[in-house]
Amino acid sequence: MKKIILSISIFFLFLLNLNAHVDHYEKINYLEYELLRNNQTIGYHKYRFLRNNDNLNVESEVSFKISKLGIQLYSYYAKSTEKYKKGKFFEFSSTTNQNKKEKYVNITVDPKEKDLVVDGSSFKGKTSNEFIIGTWWNHEIVKKKAQISAVSGRIIEQNVKFVGKEEVKIGDKVYKTLRFNFSSSDPSLSKDKKLNTDIWYEENTYTWIKAAFDKTGYWEYRLKEIR
């Protein structure tokens, strides 16, 4: 019982400490993650944080390939730009080549109603400004009832569960982390559309350290470099 109460207390303390703005990441300029499938490195995910006065652009690049016996079975490449002005979301755009299938999403803010305007390959329309782009670097995602696919604009309603405190070892470094599970709140979704991902954030900095999920294999994102 004491452990349960402690876990709940830690979770709410985490929520209270979440900065309402992305200024929390003002000391981060670059994040790079190693992407693994079944414990084999297959690619990377890189973020660059570019600042100009009160403007922040977060540029992302993801690339991976799956091969067997020297034959390429699957390839994926995506680029995106996430823009903030004075700490608030302003605009997002991405293009993705998913095994030779093109996907995209553009998101802006309605200047009057402040809703998010989504133009994507899977969804077009307005949605709540309480939703967040599904880019895991921003720890505010743990507070949100839904995330917007950074690939296609699909609205993914989610449940977030605090799993507990864990030590995560990557290479020679050990991180003290808070582990969360993200799952789809819509039970009617097909298996390939359901969200079920574990995310680890560093306890004191809220930096994204690791992600893991099962989908035709065991996938992991592991922090490789931060500067």
Question: What role is predicted for each listed range?
Answer:
Residues M1-I4:
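Positively charged n-region of N-terminal signal peptides that target proteins for export
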Residues L6-S7, Y206:
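General alpha-helical segment detector with a strong preference for membrane-spanning helices
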Residues S7-L15:
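Bacterial N-terminal signal peptides
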Residues L15, K126-T127, S190:
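Alpha-helical interaction segments
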Residues H21-D110, H139-R227:
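Acidic, serine/threonine-rich low-complexity disordered tracts
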Residues S94-G134:
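Hydrophobic, well-structured mid-protein blocks that either form specific transmembrane helices
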